[in-house]
Structure formats: C-alpha cells, structure tokens
C-alpha cells in the first residue's frame, strides 16, 4: 500500500452524532446546544418551508436563537458559498444548520468550513451521501460541475427524520 493511501486511511472522519427516526428533527436543539446558541439555517426553499415549524419546535426548549433562515441559492457555487458565509459572519451565528437535498447540504458544509463553524445537516431526501461526508461538490451558477471541495471534517450532527424523507415525492 502506498504511503499516501496509508495516511488517508489513518484519518477516517465521521459525523459527531447521528439521530434518526420519525420526529428526529425535534432533537435539533439538543444537538446544537453544545455547539452554540445562534443558528443560521440554510437550505432549499421547499425544504425550509416544510421544516421551519419543526425547526422552531426543536430549538424552543434548548434556549437557542435563529439568526436567519436563508435560501442556499440553488447551486453549491463559490458565489453562493461566499455570499452566505458573509451573511453568517454578519449575523454572528455560531452553528450552521443545512436542510434539503445534496446541493443544499453541500453548500451548508462549505459555508461552515469557510466560517470555521460546526454544521448540522438535515437531509430531506435519501438520494445522496451529502449529509454525512466531508465533501462538497461544487458547480457554477449555471449548474455545471466545477470540482470537489474536500473538507477537514464531517458535519458535527446529522438528523435523519424519516417522516420528512418518507413524504418526499418520488
């Protein structure tokens, strides 16, 4: 085995905490409470609309605040990552919560890496591995692949709410 492959195998990043099941989004406050007090929630428009009420309920008892709910921009592009990172820093958020499909989750992870903040992912579809991996696939704003952004860490938390995923259109 080559030395570079051996080095890669000695460091195996994995999400800090994974919660799954019906109603799992209710644990958002518990997961985020140890990481910060002010959440920046970003995601797809539909994903945010369908989870907003549950997100508020999930953080209510934990005494956390939401700095913003923001659309991720439609593509995991450098432009969207930079714009969202600037907003995160101006809001003084200390935890990123990314909600939606692969591109939304990848954008959230990239924003977290740029801002050096923990990221909790909430996948709303079961089609990708974006919720758990230390990788963001990037595109330009036309949706054309531009590359892979390899991150140092996986999300610190992953919430797989099966009631949300089961309600996803086929």
PLM segments and residue spans:
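Short C-terminal domain-edge/linker segments immediately following a structured domain
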Residues: 70-75, 98-101, 149-156
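A short, small-residue-rich loop immediately preceding and capping a beta-strand
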Residues: 88-111, 115-126
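ATP/NTP phosphate-donor binding region
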Residues: 1-94
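Glycine-rich nucleotide phosphate-binding loop and flanking beta-alpha elements
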Residues: 26, 48, 103-105, 126, ...
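Structural motif
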Residues: 40-42, 97-99, 159
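Short glycine-/acidic-enriched loop or helix-start segments at secondary-structure transitions
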Residues: 51-53, 107-109, 130-132
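A glycine/threonine-rich phosphate-anchoring loop and its flanking beta-alpha core
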Residues: 16, 113-170
């Amino acid at each position: 085995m080559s030395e570079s492959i051996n080095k890669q195998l000695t460091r195996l990043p994995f999400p800090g905490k994974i919660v799954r099941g019906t109603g799992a989004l209710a644990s958002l406050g518990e997961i985020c409470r140890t990481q910060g007090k002010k959440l920046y929630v970003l995601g797809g428009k539909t994903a945010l609309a369908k989870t907003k009420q549950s997100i508020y309920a999930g953080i209510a008892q934990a005494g956390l605040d939401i700095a913003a709910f923001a659309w991720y921009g439609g593509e995991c592009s450098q432009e969207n990552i930079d714009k969202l990172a600037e907003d995160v820093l101006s809001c003084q958020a200390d935890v990123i919560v990314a909600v939606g499909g692969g591109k939304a989750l990848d954008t959230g992870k990239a924003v977290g890496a740029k801002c050096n903040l923990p990221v909790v992912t909430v996948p709303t579809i079961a089609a990708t591995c974006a919720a758990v991996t230390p990788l963001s696939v990037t595109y330009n704003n036309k949706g054309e692949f531009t590359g892979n952004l390899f991150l140092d860490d996986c999300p610190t938390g992953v919430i797989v709410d099966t009631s949300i995923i089961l309600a996803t259109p086929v």
